[in-house]
Amino acid sequence: MLKEVVGLLTERQLLILETIIQDYTDLGQPIGSKTLQEQLPIRVSSATIRNEMAVLEKQGFITKEHSSSGRIPSLKGYRYYVDNLVKPVKIDSKSVRSIQSLFGNEYRRVDEIIEMSAKILSDLTNYTAITLRPEASDLKLEGFRMVPLGNGQVMVILVASDGSVESQIYNLPNNIDGESLEAVIRLINDKLVGSSLSEVTSKLQELQPLLTKYIEKSDGFIDVFGGILDKAIKEQFYIGGRRNLLNFANGNNLEQIKSLYSLIDDESAKIGGLVDNTTNPHDHHGISVKIGDEMSDRLLLDYSLVSATYNVGGHGRGMIAILGPTNMPYSKMIGLVEVFQKELTKKLIDYYRNFDE
C-alpha cells in the first residue's frame, strides 16, 4: 500500500494531480487517462489511473467538464497544488538582467517607478499587473469631517495618514438636522478612523443600518463617501495590461465579458482594491496566491492573484501582483514575481538613497 502524503493523498494520487494540473496549464484541454499514462514518470495501467482519478474527483480535487471523458483541476485542486506541490522555477540570469535593464531609466518620482513596474510586469507575463506604491500599504483613514456650505450642502472631507486630503460635496436630505449630522460624524470617527483604507471600504457597508438612524436615505451618503475613498485608494496604485483579463474570459459568455469590460474600465479602485496588506494564510515563502472565490469579486472565479510585499525600510512597504487565469503556470509565475519583487526593491532603495542625500 502506498503511504499517505501531506495527510490526504497517496504519492501516486499526488503525482496524477500534479500531472493533470501541469498538462492542463500547457494544453488548456481536459486530461484523460490515456494522456496521463503517457505523461506519468511511473508505469501504471490505464484502469488504475481511472480509479485514482475517480478518487481525486470524489474528494473534489478534479472535476469533469461537460461530456468530455477528461478531467480538469478544481479550485480546491489548484489550492492543494499551490500549497503542497508547487516548486518555484529559478529565473535564469539572462531574464534577471532583462528585468534590470527595463528598470534602467532615471526616475524623478517614486510614482514613475511604480507605474513603470506595472507595465513591465504585465509585459513579462501577459497578465494584468497591479503595483502599490510603498507609502500606500500602511495608509489609514486619519480624519473625517463634514463642513457646512449652506443651501443644504456639506463638504465631506477624508484625511489619510500620509496627509493627503480628498473631498466631495454632499447634498443633505431635507429632514436632517445639525444634531443628526454630528451623530454621523461621531459614528464615522468612532468606527472607521484608524482603519486601513482597504478595510474602510468593507466596514462602510456594515455601518449602513446605523447610519440610517440619522440619515433616512443613507445610500446617497455612502455613495459619496465611497467615491471619495475610491479616489484616495486609486491614487496609490497602478495597473498594467487591464485588457489582458479579457484574454482568459469564456468567449461564449457574453455577460461575463461585458462585466469584465466594466471592471477593467471602472475608474474606481475595484481592481486595485484586490491587492491589500492583509496576511494571507496561503503565503508561499513571502508570495501570496489567491485562487478563484478567495478573491472578493465573483467575476474573478476563473482567475488567480499572485502577489508579494516589498519593503524599502523607513519609506514603507508596497505590493506587486499579477492577475491571470487559474490555469496559469504557478511555478513560473511565483518564481518571476519573487525575482521582480527583489529587483523593484533594489531600484526603490537606490532611488530613495539619492533622494535622501
Each model region followed by its residue ranges:
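Residue-level marker of regulatory loop/turn positions in helix-turn-helix DNA-binding domains and
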Residues: 9, 28-29, 249
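Short, leucine-enriched amphipathic alpha-helices that occur as contiguous helical runs
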Residues: 9, 13-17
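N-terminal intrinsically disordered/low-complexity leader segments
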Residues: 1-8
